[in-house]
C-alpha cells in the first residue's frame, strides 16, 4: 500500500508539471503486492500548495513531542523555526536522548554557516550534535522509539514551507532497529561537537552568521 501511495505522489507531480495537460489512468500503475510486510507505513507528501497547513511539519513536531526515550535526526541543513527549536529543547529537558547529525563537509558554504549557528542554543540545552566527517551526507531521517521517517525532508524552513517534499512514516520493530543500527554506525564515524568548541568557532563565522540568519528563509 505504501508503494502505491508513493506512486500516486509521483503521478500527481508528473501531471501537475506537464506542459500539456493529460489525463493519467492511475489504476493502470497499481500493482498488487506479492505479500504484505510487517512494517506499518504511511506516505506523507507536502508542498506550498498546502500552506499554512503543512502535514510534514506537523508530523515532525509530533514525533519530537511524543518521544520519551530517544530522538535521532539526520539532516544536511539545520535551520530551525523557533517553535521547532523549542520542541527539541523541551524533549531533552524531559530526559529524551536527542542527537542531531549533520555533514562536516557541506555542499553549500552558507548552509554550513547557518547550520552551525543553530548549534549554539541546542548544545547549551543538552542536545548532542554530531558532524559526519568522512564526506558529505545528504540523508534525511528522524527516529524515535515510536516510529521513523525517511524521505526528502530537511530540518529547515524551505522544506516545511517552500518545497514539495515527501517521506515515509514507518512503525515496526525490525525497521526501527535497522535504522537505529545505522545511526549507531554513523555516530561512531562522526565527530561530536561540544558547546565549548562551538563557542571557539572562527571569529569571521561569528560576524557573518547573525547576518545570514536574518535571511535564512531565503536559502
Question: What residues fall within each predicted segment?
Answer:
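Charged, low-complexity intrinsically disordered terminal segments
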Residues: 1-219
